[in-house]
Amino acid sequence: MFAVLKTGGKQYKVQAGDVLRVEKLACEAGDKIQFNDILMVGGDSVTVGAPFVAGAAVQAEVIAQIKGEKTIHYVKRRRKHSSQRTKGHRQQLTLLRVTDVLASGADASGVAVATGTADARRAAHNASAKE
């Protein structure tokens, strides 16, 4: 059975046992997380969501928090200025192993829902604003 999930603004086609590199999630290595934004579930029959499949989920285990490959941005300005600048960037990523694809029954699984770091910051900000 496979599923198409959405996280970090991207879509991934996964099945049990797959290892994924996704945008950084607010969790620690060894945590079990669940993705509820499932766009499609397939197997014997295919179910396409509008926009999400109700009750479907993908459960995964966090292997590690890693950094992506370094990208280097080099800027050289035009004549008579002799100015150069080099900037590097390494994207923060989360390494996951998919443990299970659930076509239904995701609400009763008891596994924590995966949230990105931006979602976690937004929730903390909203909680402090209410106090």
From Swiss-Prot:
BP GO terms, sorted: translation
UniProt key word Coiled coil: no
GO cellular component terms listed in the entry, alphabetical order: cytoplasm; ribonucleoprotein complex; ribosome
A Pfam family annotated for this UniProt entry: Ribosomal_L21p
Keyword tags: Ribonucleoprotein, Ribosomal protein, RNA-binding, rRNA-binding
GO molecular-function terms, A-Z: rRNA binding; structural constituent of ribosome
HAMAP family: Ribosomal_bL21
Family listed: Belongs to the bacterial ribosomal protein bL21 family.
Subunit structure: Part of the 50S ribosomal subunit. Contacts protein L20.
Role summary: This protein binds to 23S rRNA in the presence of protein L20.
Name the record gives this protein: Large ribosomal subunit protein bL21
UniProt source species: Cereibacter sphaeroides (strain ATCC 17023 / DSM 158 / JCM 6121 / CCUG 31486 / LMG 2827 / NBRC 12203 / NCIMB 8253 / ATH 2.4.1.)
Gene name in the database record: rplU
